[in-house]
């Protein structure tokens, strides 16, 4: 449906603001409704629709705060990956196999394999517990497959991971 549009809004990074979250339009952007909001400190960084089922939507919410001279806070208790199976009406936080906020969970970048929607990859910023993770059950559970921080070490800045459009076993990170 080309009239259905989703937007991830991080909000400004210098303090709390109510504009953060995931928004949806069902009329091509004429009107918007906020469909996922955690709090005024947690913004949405990414929203992705399953390429094979438009009712399944994932969103990365990140509680990050920029301070003066780069002394911000880059993780917060509400950071995480969220999944909706009903077009964005309800959301569930995906936690199985992912680092916790107590372990330093920050920003997540993720992708869905176009050839197999059950296969997902994510770069997870979480200090020693971070890395590149893989899910084989559409985000319900995750396994860390790479710990070398050269592949994911600036996840709070970039958090990019992509899967090859023809081969779900090939993944790229930046």
Pin down the residues of each PLM region.
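Beta-propeller blade termini and top-face loops
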Residues: 1-174
């Amino acid at each position: 449906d080309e009239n259905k549009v989703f937007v991830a809004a991080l909000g400004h990074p210098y303090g709390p603001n109510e504009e953060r979250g995931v928004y949806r339009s069902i009329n091509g952007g004429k009107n918007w409704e906020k469909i996922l909001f955690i709090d005024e400190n947690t913004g949405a960084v990414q929203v992705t629709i399953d390429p094979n089922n438009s009712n399944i939507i994932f969103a990365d919410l990140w509680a990050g705060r920029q301070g003066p001279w780069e002394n911000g806070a880059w993780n917060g208790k509400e950071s995480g990956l969220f999944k909706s199976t009903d077009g964005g009406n309800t959301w569930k936080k995906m936690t199985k196999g992912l680092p916790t906020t107590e372990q330093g969970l920050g920003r997540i970048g993720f992708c869905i394999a176009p050839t197999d929607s059950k296969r997902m990859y994510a770069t997870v910023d979480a200090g020693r517990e971070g890395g590149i993770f893989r899910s084989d059950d559409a985000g319900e559970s995750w396994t860390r497959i790479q710990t070398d921080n050269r592949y994911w070490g600036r996840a709070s800045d970039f958090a990019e991971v992509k899967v090859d459009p023809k081969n779900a076993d090939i993944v790229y990170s930046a």
